[in-house]
Amino acid sequence: AYGGGNIMDWIGHHNDIAHWGAGMDASGPEEVEAIGWTQSSTDVYDTPVDYEIRCVYPGGVDWVIASHLPMGTRWIGEEGWVAVDRGKLTASDERWTRLDYDPGPVVIPASTDHIDNFIQGIKSRRTCVASAETAHRSITPGHLGFASHALGRRLRFDARTERVLNDSQAHALLDKTYRKPWKR
């Protein structure tokens, strides 16, 4: 889905945080379905202006990526919710947003400068906060959403093998033949 419009632009900025917060950086959805997509009323764009991608992740975790929802990431649990959006933190329980709140043993790496973090990663050979693998896994639901929309059906996906299951037509949309001399 080259040039995938707002979906493919913003999914990398928010879904990476969603994966990170849910402990699913190296994972992906098991099911994806595109719902209610509408195209631009002009011929300037060929990507949807309104969209919803519903995903099911391992453990039955429901995941919604949609243009009608506020920007950012929200985790909803049995005791309430926590949301982040490009530096802003809100929660159903205000105590969870206080700086003196003890989150437990979780250590979150900080990066206020992705460019410097990337350069330092090259120099040190350490994984960057926003690694290529994280970016790839974060935008995968968007690519699958485009395939689901194009075919008008829900897709089942194996994140380990990165294959659409039992749907060669859908998989073909996502797995293009490489030009020579490039190989897999």
Please describe what each predicted stretch is.
Residues A1-M8, W37-T42, Y101-I108, I122-T134:
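Active-site rim elements
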Residues A1-P58:
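Rossmann-like dinucleotide-binding domain that binds NAD(P)(H)
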Residues G5-M8, G12-H19, T112-D116, E133-H143:
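A structural signal for well-ordered alpha-helical segments within the folded catalytic domains
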Residues W10, H14, W20, D46, ...:
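Tryptophan-centric aromatic hotspots in well-structured domains and transmembrane helices
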Residues M24-A34, D62-I65, V82-D85, T127-S131, ...:
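Acidic/polar loop patches that form or flank catalytic/metal-binding clefts of enzymes
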Residues G28, V49-Y51, L69-M71, E78, ...:
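Residues that flank catalytic or metal-binding motifs in active/ligand-binding sites
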Residues D43, C55-T112:
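NAD(P)-dinucleotide binding in Rossmann-like oxidoreductases
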Residues D46, Q120-R184:
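C-terminal helix-rich "cap/oligomerization" subdomain common to oxidoreductases
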